[in-house]
């Protein structure tokens, strides 16, 4: 193994006169080279474009070099070597937590480095910083100020520094915070993960070149950060690997085989990846910039000399000489970046033209918006057209639509229950699953599904058990006035009370669920309106920026739907009060005995024969036929009778009396008995006798549906309590049937859907536009809004000027390519 002292000797100073002569001759050759002049103009154009992109938040695919690595892997030293001067003279660990965009400009007139920092919120640069020690202080202070403002440990917002110097290349590098395993004292524990995530985000764009640094003392197989680089660029196609502090490894090489194996890095980086091996001066004493650059050059020379003379057999110079030394890396980075700049110039020019056009359009829209703040008539017209368009889209969604995609905007039954906050149906213990419950629906389809779900829930409720005390309190009160009448009225009163108690919450829940379905249509109508305008490229007024107006439209629509729900609740409650009135019993009783739709509901989740509800979800195929909600049960002559086909012994009471018939036809039976009863008995006794003498088979109620039993096992042998309970269940079923089939369904449709189709645009128009101009303009011009719009226009104008300047410069560059 070679002695380590043989390759590092104390640097000696080059005579000042000879050094100045070398520098002057090099600068003269650079100034006379037309290729370098062309490269510099291209580099300057990209630098200005990069500054504009940082200032205005533009996402431009500018070729850039991103330096990544561990916090102690020598990134700062490499940047200083590229700059040609030291800026962290005091060797203080900056520990920056923000990216640093370092724009190096080869300026022959800058015999001393001139560093300027771009303003945080502008594309302008500050005054030149002459003191090298001030550079690190500015980086540190800016980082601390931003992190304190954002209350974060790291920030992706970059610091931009422009360094003009005669001894630096035309190069731009983004220095990233170094990877760390553990947070510094006072930092959050998540800081290492946040740094890793931010660096990956900065290095991921495909137009960026990765400059990955790793100390030579770290073996490839145990590299902690090499895996992170592989996640960003798995094939290393855009990664330049730099082995830093290479001088620390030289003493371990004894023969050529060891050196060549190490330099090839075979088995870890792939066959086409050749890392660069760099060593930099370790002397951190205060020296001049010229001496610093001389030491860099001397270290390169000493490393090559040691590999040639200090290692037995030397090394494969033909294969590895171009990858060793800082000078080789600097030349490669500069040439590689210039090559990428040249390749990207046409695409950059096209992108700049597109961005300039977009900014011009934004300027026109902003001018129109500022002008519109004083044109009330124009705003009224645009707002009315927009509101009418939204209302029309709501109507179209109610009538049935497939745009936008129901898979994205629709909801299943479970999602509706959860998002509405209503949950299950009150008083229903079973899980109600209407047809198509698993499909994502909206609009009219979702409305009809909720209606059917309400029907299923209503028919799942049985008449609740009644205590003997309640029966006795009603029955015994009528004991002295005829037992038959007492039994009938007791059962009817029990049924009416149960219906009011159990069906009223169902009606309120149905209204709330339907209101949620209609309320959800506003967002879908907005999306539909946006898609339609985009699809047909309609030149309608852009209302996107008027937040106050959009909030007002949303609030008006929400109030409209809530008012509909309130009105519908009152209507269905009125129907419930009517059907549970003692005077309505004769109507639904007679109709029932002639055969009504009620007989079809022998299971809680079955629809009536007149209801059409198609099961479209896949789950229905696997269920037994008897559980199909949308298929009516098979008819049984012994259990139900077709409406209008009753037996001759039954009295037909029309559901809706004909205008040509007097009302006495409907209630003639009762009136005749009141006026002409031969036995002198009152109407109530006659009614009790009429009900008691009908040929009705005994029955029982199961799951809310009517199940007929044999007459031999009927009420003849039952007690008065059992008779009343059975009769109450019968009355409850009749009340429920009349309420659901005749009243509620049609009321909900006419109470919700018809107003949304016919009155929505009028209601919104009255709320929004039937006001004076001052109140109307409050939706569009908030206090100070005009000043904000004017400031936005100034920013757009500034952005337009910068981008136009970059475009002109790139056009000049493109002509020279």
From Swiss-Prot:
One of its GO terms (molecular function) is GTP binding. Residues 1-37, 405-425, 616-658 are annotated as: Disordered. Residues 244-247 are annotated as: G4 motif. Residues 280-283 are annotated as: G5 motif. This is Dynamin-related protein 5A. Induction: Expression is cell-cycle regulated. Expressed during mitosis from the prophase to the telophase. It comes from Arabidopsis thaliana. Keywords: Cell cycle, Cell division, Cytoplasm, Cytoskeleton, GTP-binding, Hydrolase, Microtubule, Motor protein, Nucleotide-binding. Disruption phenotype: No visible phenotype under normal growth conditions, but when grown at 16 degrees Celsius, seedlings grow slowly and root tip cells form incomplete or twisted cell plates. The keyword Ribonucleoprotein does not apply. Residues 618-629 have a biased composition (Basic and acidic residues). One of its GO terms (biological process) is cytokinesis by cell plate formation. InterPro entries: Dynamin, Dynamin_GTPase, Dynamin_N, G_DYNAMIN_dom, P-loop_NTPase. Its main location: cytoplasm. Residues 69-76 are annotated as: G1 motif. It holds the Pfam family Dynamin_N. Probable microtubule-associated force-producing protein that is targeted to the forming cell plate during cytokinesis. May play a role in cell division. Residues 59-346 form the Dynamin-type G domain. One of its GO terms (cellular component) is microtubule. Residues 95-97 are annotated as: G2 motif.
